[in-house]
Amino acid sequence: MQKLVFSRATPVVLFLAISLCSVAADEMATTNLLASQTRTFDPQLAPMSLHTRGKKVLDAGGKRVWLYGVNIASLEWSTDGEHVEESVNRAINDWKVNLIRLPLAQDRWFGKMTNQTDGGAAYRALVDKLVDACAAGRVYIDLDLHWSDCGQWMNEGGTLGQHSMPDKNSITFWQDLATRYKNQPNVIFDLYNEPHDVSFAVWRDGGTVTNTPEHKKPGQAKIIYEAVGMQTLYDTVRAVGATNLVAAGGLNWAYDLSGVLRGYGIKGTNLIYETHPYQNKTNWDKNFGDPSWKYPVYIGEWGFSAHTTNGLGYAQSLMQYARKHKLPWTAWDMHVTAGPPLIKNWDYEPTVSGQFVKEQLAAAAAAHGTNK
C-alpha cells in the first residue's frame, strides 16, 4: 500500500475537497428534484401579461388592471385538495372573480409527503388544471407558497407548516414552479405567505431564525434554521427567465410593509407588495397605505367573522380604503372550514362574510368589468 504523505497544506486541501463534494452533492440533489419543463400557453392570453408602473398594475397594452377575488385553500394541507376544481369553477362563474389566490406547499409539490409515491406529479398536474381553468376564464391566478419545512423535507423528518420564514427548500420550489409557469400571462408568483417575528433585514436578506413547530408535541424542541430572504426568492424567480408579476408579503403575518420605506425594499421590477389586514390589525396608513409609497400594494388576505355581522363595519371600511387607494384584493377563504370561511357548505351557500364579499365582487365587476 502506498504511503500517504501529508503536508501542512493537507488539512486545507482535504477541507476544500470535502466542502466542494458537499456543495456538489447538494446541487445534484436539487437538480434531481427539478421536475418541470416550461409549459406552453395559448397566444391569445398574451394581452393578459402584467407589469407595474409606479403604483399601477398594467396589462400588455398598458391598460390598468383591477384585480379582485378570493383565496381557495386546501392544497397546503391536502395533497389532493378539497373541492378545489369546483371552487375555482364557482369562483369564476358564480362569484365573478378575476383573481384567485391558491395556497401551495413546497413538500407536496415535490412529493415529499409520506402519502405521495409519484414525486409530486399528481399534485403538479392538479395545479396545472387550475391554472388552465383560470386561463380559460381569463382569470389571473396567484400561486402562493403557503407552507414550508424549515429546510428539511417531510419524508426526512421535517415539519411542514406555516413557518416564520422560507428556507433553502423554498429556493428549489421557486426554481421549479417558476420554470413551469414562467411568462404564462395569467400567473402571479407569491413568494411566501406570512413572514413574521423577524427583522426586516432578515425578511429581505435571510438569516438564522428560531421557529416553534406548529402542532408542537410536549418536549419538542424549537427549530433553528437558516431562513432565506425575499430578495433571494425574487432573484430565483428571475434567474429562470420568468418575468411574471411577483408578490411579496411583509412582516407581522404579511401585514406590515413599513420596512420597505426604511430601506429594506426588494430590488427588482414587476413587483407588488402584499398585506393581510385582518380585523385585529390597525393603523393601515402606517403599515401599507403611506402616501409616499411608490409601489403597488395588494391585499392578499382579509376577512371577518363568517356567521355574524360583528365585522361588517371593518369590512366596509377596508373596501372603502381599497377603492380609495386602488388596491387589488383577494378575500379569505372559499372553503367551509378555513376561517373565516366564505361558504357554509359545499353547495357554496355564502356565509354572512361570504355574501358581503360576493356583493363586493359584483360591484367591482360592474365598475371595472371582468377579464372575459
Which residues fall in each region the model found?
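Aromatic- and acidic-residue-enriched carbohydrate-binding clefts of CAZyme catalytic domains
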Residues: 113-123, 154-164, 208-215
